[in-house]
Amino acid sequence: MRVLVCAFALLFAWPAQAAPLRIVSLDYCADQFVLALADRSQIAALSRGSQRDDSYFRARAAGIRQTRGTLEEVLALRPDLVVRSWGGPWDAEAVYGRFGVPVLQVGGAPDFDGARATLLSAAVRLGHPERGAALARDLDQRLARLAALPAPRDPAAMYLSAGGATAGRGTMMDSTISAAGGRNLRTEESWAVLPLERLVERPPALVALGFFDHGRTRMNAWLPGRHPAVRRALDRARTVTLPPAAISCEAWFAIDAAEAIAAALRAP
């Protein structure tokens, strides 16, 4: 019910305008919103990252034109809406506004409430509020199922990327661990590089691994996550490898990662 109320409120709050017919997406996080919510016929171009293996909806991107995202190339596509998370110029709204092209900013949610709100508003702007409402409803149902699970015996958990980054408060990863029933051991704000000795000396009950087997990180032996001492610590700890596509953008589909963490926390 809450999802439907929010969707209708957004629908009537947004200025009346036709659904965009020539959408250009500037980065692979924006691609996910466009691929999930827009008709294929509405998409003029996606970013060159739309078919990366950490692009959540990469299968839907097959056959759709790609753009490098330069101003000249995008304008040549005659878009009536540009969608971005981080791609293009930092002041994209002002830059494209000079040419009469509106910009929709998406992604970057710090938690699932923010992800839901961004999803619903993007769906309205792309002309398909019912699709956003359906995805938000699925998200809420899955969050409710996680909340109903018995508490894990030891909820202590930590996220670690192959680059040595770990997530603290105010991040989607922190929200993901919490939704899974875990207790994030990093209580500081935002992201930081984890001191390796902390992991080696006091490994948590569960380490959620990100991008350890992804693309170039698979081949880079110099990354902090490849350090022999770290590998030994991880061998002693319980680990779960998170699907790269679920955590590459701060969006609603991070629920996949939450479910993976929840299962690992409660595994015998």
Please provide the spans of the model-predicted regions.
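Short, structured coil segments at secondary-structure junctions
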Residues: D39, R60, R98-V101, A180, ...
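Bacterial N-terminal signal peptides
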Residues: R2-P15
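Alpha-to-beta junction loops
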Residues: R78-V82, R202-A208
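Short, solvent-exposed loop/turn elements at domain surfaces
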Residues: D31-A36, Q51-Y56, A165-R169, L209, ...
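Alpha-helical, coiled-coil/dimerization segments enriched in small aliphatic residues
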Residues: R48-R52, R60-G63, T166-A192
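A short, structured surface patch at a secondary-structure boundary
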Residues: R22-L77, L81-G87, D91
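Short secondary-structure boundary segments
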Residues: D27, W86-G87, E189, G210-H214
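Extracytoplasmic substrate-binding proteins
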Residues: A19-R22, L81, D91-A165, R183-E189, ...
